[in-house]
Amino acid sequence: MQRYVEEWRHTISRIGRWVDFDNDYKTMDPWYMESVWWVFKQLWDKGLIYQGVKVMPLSTSLGTPLANFEATSNYQDVQDPAVTVLFELEDSDAYLAVWTTTPWTLPSNLAICVGNDIEYVLVEDKESNKKIYMAKERVSHYFDDIEVINTIKGSDLVQQRYKPVFPYFSDQVKDGAFVVLSDDYVTTDSGTGLVHQAPAFGEDDLRVIKSYGISAMVCPVDLHGKFTDEVSDFSGMYVKDADKKIIEYLKANNSLLRQEVIQHSYPYCYRSNTPLIYRAIPSWYVRVTDFKHKLIDANEQIN
C-alpha cells in the first residue's frame, strides 16, 4: 500500500488535483476500522441491523457481491440463449409455456408467475400434439396458424400445480413449490406471458414467493458461479457454460418448445470484466428504509 506514496503525491500534484495528503485517512488504519465498528454498534443498538437474504449482483470471478451502483457501471451488449420450456400441469394434459433468457436457473425453478388480468389461451401445437397455455398476445410470436381451444384469465391459472422439469428439488413441493402464482410485474412485452420463478436468482422471484408465504428456497450455485453437487448432472460447471447442457437436457426430455439467441444489454463486473449473475446472498443488512425519510430531509437542508 505504501510503496508508491511519493510517486502518487508527485503525479497528483502535477495534474493539478488538490488532495490533503498530510491529513488523509486509509481504510486500513486501525483507528478508521474502529470508527466503522463504532457506527455499526450504534446501528445495532437502534435495531437497524438484521440478518437476511437478498438477491444481489454477484461477481463470480471475485466471489463477492457488488453494490447495485457498481453493477450498473459496465453494461455490455451480448448474445445469450433464450428458451421456451413446457411445464406439464398436474391435473390436466395441458402445458405451461415459459420463456427465459437464463436457462441455467431452470434447475432451481420453484414456481411460475402469471398476470391476473392477462388473457391466456390454450392452443394445440400440431408438431408435438401438446396443448399449451400462453398469453393471447404472444401466440403469433410462436405459431402462424393455430386453433384456440380455450381462453381464460391469468387468475384462473393461479394455484394450479405443475410437474418440475428437473428432479433435483422435487421434495420442495412440501414447502409449497411448483405452483402458479400471480403478480403485476408480469407483462406480454416479450416471452409467453408466463414467468419462471427461481427465487435464489431473481429479486422479483423472491418477492413473489415470499408474498405467498411459500418457504421453499434452493440455491445450488456457489459464490464462483458453479453448480453444487445438488444438481448432479451439472455439478462443478460454471452456470453460463452449463446453458448448452441444460438445453440438451430439455430437448432429450421433450420439454423444449423453442430455442433462440437474443442480443441484449447485460451487466459485467467493472473490475474483472466478466458477466455478473444475480444470486441470493445471506448477510447482515442495514434497515435503510426505516430512516430513509430522515436522510431525504437532511439532504434538503444542504445548500
Q: Where are the regions that the model predicts?
A:
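Catalytic alpha/beta core of large soluble enzyme barrels
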Residues: 108-222
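Residue patterns forming the tRNA-binding/recognition surfaces of aminoacyl-tRNA synthetases
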Residues: 1-107, 159, 185, 189-303
